[in-house]
């Protein structure tokens, strides 16, 4: 089939959605202008970089970051644009929180964090083992 259905391939461009990455506080300050660009369907927040842009890298509970996210949500909803977010911590409650706020594009944690978190949990369970237990 490869190479024989060019019309089908060409027409798929109608289904492509353009999502921009928002990783700096200045992008949120200019979000209306960014989302007004023809062809942009939504945006995606990178929380590490966004928090870093305000000098609070990784501080996801910072008040200034919370205000930026509320502004992001308000503008995105007003402009009827899809919202995305990278939920770093592998916690289903944080995932549901974003879904309930209207986020429809979500990255859930990342491989090294997931593996490391689970490994640390399991190692705590086995820290009392002796050689006789193995």
How would you describe each model-predicted region?
Residues 1-134:
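Expand to "…catalyze enediolate/carbanion chemistry for C-C bond making/breaking, isomerization
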